[in-house]
């Protein structure tokens, strides 16, 4: 029997009475109280998440930008220091190995954040793809903890935490840092990366610290947030990201799925100079018959789930990739890959929910946008 990996905050989660689940070989908190309560807490106030199972890969050296331009679909060399970019790691055939956020750090290095399920694969791919360049690829996953604070009061809580700490970070700069930008500094003697990024559809921060500082950072944030900050597990993170129309690897993304199918054609930069992995395959691919990702909404309380068939006039035209009864909106929502001729906004389709037809309508993503 394989022993599950534990994050640096495992003891904290146990003390809070969390329920755990196996996620990509990690023993992760799935919930602390209830999925709904945690979901609503993030939409109304703020939630705190342990995301230390994610992978962190540092790319350093004079050719870092060029190496990432070759390894990834985006033009990372054009990303200014202190900014971040969402990009894709592709196969030679143009399928998606992983979707990633890459930070161009103020010191000139790049930090690539990989999904937990793909961290080892991603590391191997970056090591192989960067071998021709003058760079160093370093796996910092085991030494790094990641804590996210997300929700309407996230900014207030993080600023309050900074005021309680001995830090080189400027509170005004942290407050004003824009979406997909980051700052570095020290927090009570530990290095910290503060990024205005997230996976919930809400405002907030993701904070990276050494693993040994994880419990200290968590408690600092909890003390600052008080009743306005709720510990949140992976269950509500999934419902939050689905409402926000954000893809999840293994559901909306995979090596058999190409970027344009998932609505991510914009992420692939064909204008950048030189080759990149997957370029030739995508440039020569006929996409006219590819199924495409759409949003579906329905009425009532029954929700389609991953794998359920999408039907049009008694013909199966697709399948759901993720589906829930939306806690925020109060009706069923789903993302699905469907045939292109039924993907137009406003098209009526049905979902086979255990032998019963759920009437749905194709809608624009995301389902939820914060005001």
UniProtKB/Swiss-Prot annotation:
UniProt cross-references to InterPro entries, sorted A to Z: GCS_T, GCS_T_bac, GCST_C, GCV_T_N, GcvT/YgfZ/DmdA, GcvT/YgfZ_C, TrmE/GcvT_dom1
Domain of life: Bacteria
Keyword Transferase: yes
Catalytic reaction list: N(6)-[(R)-S(8)-aminomethyldihydrolipoyl]-L-lysyl-[protein] + (6S)-5,6,7,8-tetrahydrofolate = N(6)-[(R)-dihydrolipoyl]-L-lysyl-[protein] + (6R)-5,10-methylene-5,6,7,8-tetrahydrofolate + NH4(+)
Alphabetical list of Gene3D superfamilies matching this protein: Aminomethyltransferase beta-barrel domains (3.30.70.1400), Aminomethyltransferase fragment (4.10.1250.10), Probable tRNA modification gtpase trme, domain 1 (3.30.1360.120)
Pfam families in the cross-refs: GCV_T, GCV_T_C
Keywords from the named record: Aminotransferase, Transferase
Biological process per Gene Ontology, one example term: glycine decarboxylation via glycine cleavage system
EC number(s) given by UniProt: 2.1.2.10
Recorded GO MF terms: aminomethyltransferase activity; transaminase activity
Signal peptide range: none
Residue ranges the record marks as coiled coil: none
Record bears the keyword Transferase: yes
One cellular-component annotation, GO: cytosol
Cited HAMAP family: GcvT
NCBIfam families reported for this sequence: gcvT, PRK00389.1
Protein family (similarity comment): Belongs to the GcvT family.
Subunit structure: The glycine cleavage system is composed of four proteins: P, T, L and H.
Summary of the function given for this chain in its UniProt record: The glycine cleavage system catalyzes the degradation of glycine.
Protein name, per record: Aminomethyltransferase
Source species: Cutibacterium acnes (strain DSM 16379 / KPA171202) (Propionibacterium acnes)
Lineage, top ranks: Bacteria, Bacillati, Actinomycetota, Actinomycetes, Propionibacteriales
Gene: gcvT
């Amino acid at each position: 029997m394989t022993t599950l990996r534990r994050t640096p905050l495992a003891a904290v989660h146990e003390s809070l009475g969390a329920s755990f689940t196996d996620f990509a070989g990690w023993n992760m908190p799935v919930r602390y109280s209830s999925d709904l309560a945690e979901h609503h807490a993030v939409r109304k106030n703020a939630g705190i998440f342990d995301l230390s199972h994610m992978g962190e890969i540092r790319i350093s050296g004079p050719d870092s930008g060029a190496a990432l331009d070759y390894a990834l679909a985006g033009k990372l060399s054009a990303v200014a220091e202190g900014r971040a970019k969402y990009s894709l790691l592709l196969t030679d055939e143009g399928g998606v190995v992983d979707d990633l956020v890459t930070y161009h750090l103020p010191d000139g290095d790049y930090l690539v954040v990989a999904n937990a399920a793909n961290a080892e694969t991603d590391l191997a791919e970056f090591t192989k793809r960067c071998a021709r360049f003058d760079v160093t690829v370093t796996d910092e996953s085991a030494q790094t903890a990641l804590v996210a604070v997300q929700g309407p009061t996230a900014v207030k809580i993080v600023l309050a935490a900074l005021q309680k700490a001995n830090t080189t970070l400027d509170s005004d700069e942290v407050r004003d840092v824009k979406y997909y930008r980051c700052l570095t500094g020290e927090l009570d003697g530990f290095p910290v990366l503060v990024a205005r990024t997230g996976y919930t559809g809400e405002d907030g921060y993701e904070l990276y610290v050494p693993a040994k500082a994880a419990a200290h950072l968590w408690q600092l944030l909890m003390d600052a947030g008080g009743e306005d900050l709720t510990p949140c597990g992976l269950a509500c993170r999934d419902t939050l990201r689905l409402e926000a129309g954000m893809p999840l690897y293994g559901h909306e993304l995979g090596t058999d799925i190409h970027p344009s199918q998932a609505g991510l054609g914009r992420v692939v930069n064909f204008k950048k100079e030189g080759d990149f992995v997957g370029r030739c395959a995508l440039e020569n691919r006929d996409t006219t018959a590819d199924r495409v990702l759409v949003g579906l909404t329905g009425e009532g309380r029954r929700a389609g789930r991953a794998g359920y068939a999408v039907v049009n006039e008694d013909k199966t035209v697709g399948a759901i990739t993720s589906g829930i009864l939306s806690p925020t909106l109060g009706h069923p929502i789903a993302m699905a890959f469907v045939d292109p001729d039924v993907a137009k906004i406003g098209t009526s389709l049905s979902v086979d929910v255990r032998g019963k037809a759920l009437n749905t309508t194709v809608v624009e993503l995301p389902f939820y946008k914060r005001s």
